[in-house]
Amino acid sequence: MDTASEEYNFTSFSYLPFYTKVNVRLLDLAEVGKQRKIVDLGCGTGGVTKLILERLQSAKDTVIYAVDHSTTALKAAAEEIGERKELVVNYVHSEAQNLTDAVKERVDAIVYCNSIHYVPDKAKLVKQIKEKLTPQGIFAFNTSFFEGSHPEDSHEFFRKWMMRSLRILKREHGLSPIKSGKVESRVQLTANQYIDLVESAGLKVLVNDLNRVEVPHEGWHQISGFSDWIEGVMPGVPLDKGRESLQKGLGQIWTEMELKTVPRVWLSVSASKFNTVE
């Protein structure tokens, strides 16, 4: 389902250096490079897939499954990654929730970067992931959409940014958000609830990492052009009008507050099937 057009996708944000470091941290904490059969769930245009490839201790006999719901993203990933001699990269068109059907064999590691918050039935997905792992397999994920991801010293920025953007939206476009149900990424779990989710599926948590990241202007500017972000903070507003208002409001507040970065917290979790009962 290639919706909301490629103009409003996550790609430009996903290649920013600070965001790459966030995902590198997860892969290194989970020691994904030691594994042979690896799923990159929600791979997008292949940014994390490339990071996995760079960390492989041995490429021989390695199989990577790059899974995404967007055929356009998978095509871009295949072009970006290219042919590999010693390993196989399989590009799989599927929703994350259909993992059982998308990947037939058991794998050593499943990586899910900054997307688990979108999944409506997270418990069902994590159970699928457990069933798909080999006996000592690893599940690693991160997210910046959880209760507590905004440090207290970022609250003033967000309040001013949203208020200014809403005023711009009303003044320049005569629009206001439609106050309806939240999109799934805005219905947020706490970090502890994510841990409970993993443990309830029968996995053992190995890494529970909260990482404060200083996000530069470019990060907030790019995320303001992402359809899910716009729909989350300005539900019902046309994407082009929402993006324009958010980015204009951001620029004004950034200058007025004389900011260099604004912090956000990423949760990174690695869990193992080790010693769990089949």
Residue ranges of predicted features:
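Conserved class I S-adenosyl-L-methionine
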Residues: A140-K170
